[in-house]
Amino acid sequence: MLEEYELIWPSWLRSRRIGTCAEADRGRRKNTMIFSGGAALSSPLLLLAVLEDPVIFLAYLPLGGMFTIYAVSLIRLRHYMRAGRSLWSATESGVVMEVPRELMILDLAPWVLYLSFAFSGAFEMICSDYLPGSFLGVAFVLSSVGAVRCFWRSLPARERILVTGEGVRLTRITGQSSFIPWSQKPSASHVNGGDLLINTKGRVDEMRFPMSLLPVSCRQFQRLLDTFSRSVSKRHRLDGPYALRTVLDVLEPTEEEYSDSSWTWARPEVSQGGA
């Protein structure tokens, strides 16, 4: 099941507060500013560290790299969200949303950062008694175990959402997926730690689905689940030639989503090359 696997992004970077979908959408802009500020602030600190002690520099470098990766990830996410309509397509299986390869790479980049610098720390731990080296050596072991655990069963997946007349299939970047029939009345209203909390009929606990680098807003996802779990007529359209048009109509942002500070699709006239 989806909730058995942790996000690629470190859990300690994600707020434990439970918020609404609207709050989560508007919060993406704030998170970008925070990570961009952290990346800018880390540059002079790294310069001072390398002048003071190379070992201290080695300890701080992953932190600066982490802020930079997350800032770039969110900036690129905004770009792809504006072009969100083009990410959905009709296939023989149903209506599919695929994540661009660039976002997949950025989603995996933290592991590359941890493993590369932690490997240097492990070498430092063997060659000296410095505390930073020991710390990074432990981080190397933990990162290696986490990477193997995430991708042991499958390779990174581009397809994240599949909508059919029977239900919706949600897939993580790790390739682990879960199918939710419309008969289970899936719904979502809250977000916790970057994960959308999905409620289903007959299930006590919520299913968690990561939204951090998914180019769809939480309110769009909420509307998708609510509409097709309630409307039989719209579900029937998913099995016909107008399946893609039906899904895009449901996902079309509201005027509130266009006007507030959240990221969403560009207005139709803009996405089609208009003014």
Predicted regions, residues:
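N-terminal membrane-targeting/pre-transmembrane regions
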Residues: 1-39, 52-117
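Actinobacteria-biased recognition of intrinsically disordered, low-complexity terminal regions
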Residues: 1-27, 238-275
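Membrane-helix interface and helix-disruption motif detector
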Residues: 49-59, 125-133
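Alpha-helical transmembrane segments and their membrane-interface junctions
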Residues: 110-135
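Alpha-helical membrane-embedded segments
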Residues: 135-151
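Cytosolic juxtamembrane helix at the C-terminal end of the final transmembrane segment
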Residues: 150-165
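A membrane-cytosol interface segment of integral membrane proteins
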Residues: 160, 198-263
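Phosphoinositide-dependent membrane-docking surfaces
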Residues: 168-170, 175-194
